[in-house]
Amino acid sequence: DGIPSFVTAGKCASVANQDNFDLRRYAGRWYQTHIIENAYQPVTRCIHSNYEYSTNDYGFKVTTAGFNPNDEYLKIDFKVYPTKEFPAAHMLIDAPSVFAAPYEVIETDYETYSCVYSCITTDNYKSEFAFVFSRTPQTSGPAVEKTAAVFNKNGVEFSKFVPVSHTAECVYRA
């Protein structure tokens, strides 16, 4: 076994976090439109998530769904929640069979887009993932240009992102 392909030399970008992050406004349906590919995410197209705010957990119960490369429809349930050590927009992902990872909302307007960064540095290597979320499944338009500028400004190269396919056969049931 070698080093996984998503582990690369370097350190994580030091990204900004959304000021005055409002968990309740962030809740609801989001579509992934562009991603830095993630070996831990088995779905590769029609990716959508439902973020259900939970007052008891002070965070989100998340269901993400979509199709894997074998055209199987998969649903994954996990939690995303803030911690006392960081601002509210710097949360943790708690998912089955995955170590706890950061979930940093760099910027969102809550209505159209969200820029999310997740990266862990170990020694001089990083495991870097990032996501463009949209309230609609469109993969082009002004929101994409806006999110590209946000990531580039924060030291995350938007050229590393790939579009997520959202075609007519997509089913959104999460």
UniProtKB/Swiss-Prot annotation:
Top-level division of the source organism's lineage: Eukaryota
Cysteine pairings via disulfide bonds: C12-C119, C46-C170
Primary site of residence: secreted
GO BP of this protein: lipid metabolic process; response to reactive oxygen species
This protein's UniProt keywords: Disulfide bond, Pigment, Secreted, Transport
PROSITE patterns: LIPOCALIN
Molecular function per GO: pigment binding
Entry comment describing in which tissues the protein is expressed: Found in the carapace.
CC annotations in GO: cytoplasm; extracellular region
Location(s) in or outside the cell: Secreted, Extracellular space
Family annotation (Gene3D superfamilies): 2.40.128.20
Family matches, as PANTHER family: APOLIPOPROTEIN D
Oligomer status and interactors: Oligomer; Can form dimers (beta-crustacyanin); or complexes of 16 subunits (alpha-crustacyanin). There are five types of subunits: A1, A2, A3, C1 and C2.
Function: Binds the carotenoid astaxanthin (AXT) which provides the blue coloration to the carapace of the lobster.
Assigned protein family: Belongs to the calycin superfamily. Lipocalin family.
Protein name: Crustacyanin-A2 subunit
Organism per entry: Homarus gammarus (European lobster)
